[in-house]
A protein has these predicted regions:
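Divalent metal-cofactor coordination and adjacent catalytic microenvironments
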Residues: 1-197
Length: 197
């Protein structure tokens, strides 16, 4: 795939988390809700870490992939899975006007990993202005809207991190941020896809 520089970010955060505070409490064997506020924060941190390490979006969220130009081979590979849908593809034309590409020009293949946006036969990407972040693909990613939709391995990896962070506050000190619990990497290996440096 021929791609110019690209980046991907969350534009609309998940409305709910991939594991519940109740699940975290059960995993930690806590009897009351005294630590719920802390657990909520740790759940967010754990989800973000699992998503980063696995290149998967665990719960429904809106993401934006921005590129300097359309790929020369006609295929846009989205950097995270699973992809539910593509909301829009916009670009800045030669007159500095933002245009929305008609969805009739392309097909979204979300059945493969990575998910791809492919031009329909006979179509071509329009010319863009050629500046930084001129092309933006807005898409919905995640296993679904509820905890029950989320992959069980991903949920367990999150709970491992929540437990690790809760029971070892020192892991947030300088030089120890990359320490993860034993077994976490094995779970991530089963989830992640693509080439990693």
């Amino acid at each position: 795939m021929a791609l110019t520089k690209s980046r991907d970010y969350v534009s609309v955060k998940p409305a709910t988390e991939a594991v519940t505070v109740e699940q975290a409490r059960l995993h930690l064997d806590l009897d009351d809700n005294y630590y719920d506020s802390q657990l909520n924060q740790l759940i967010i941190v754990a989800r973000q870490r699992v998503e980063q390490d696995s290149r998967r979006s665990l719960i429904t969220q809106t993401r934006v992939m921005s590129m300097d130009a359309f790929p020369s081979d006609g295929i846009i590979e989205l950097p995270t899975v699973p992809v539910q849908s593509v909301s829009s593809i916009t670009y800045v034309d030669g007159n500095d006007a933002t245009q929305t590409l008609s969805s009739s020009l392309y097909l979204v293949d979300s059945n493969n990993t990575p998910s791809r946006v492919v031009l329909n036969d006979g179509e071509s990407w329009p010319n863009n202005r050629g500046h930084y972040d001129d092309v933006k693909v807005t898409y919905i990613a995640g296993y679904g809207d509820t905890v029950g939709d989320v992959d069980e391995v991903a949920k367990f990896a999150m709970l491992m991190l929540v437990s690790h962070l809760f029971n070892s506050p020192s892991v947030t000190s300088y030089g120890t941020m990359n320490i993860v619990p034993i077994g976490y990497e094995l779970l991530i290996e089963s989830l992640k896809w693509g080439q990693y440096p």
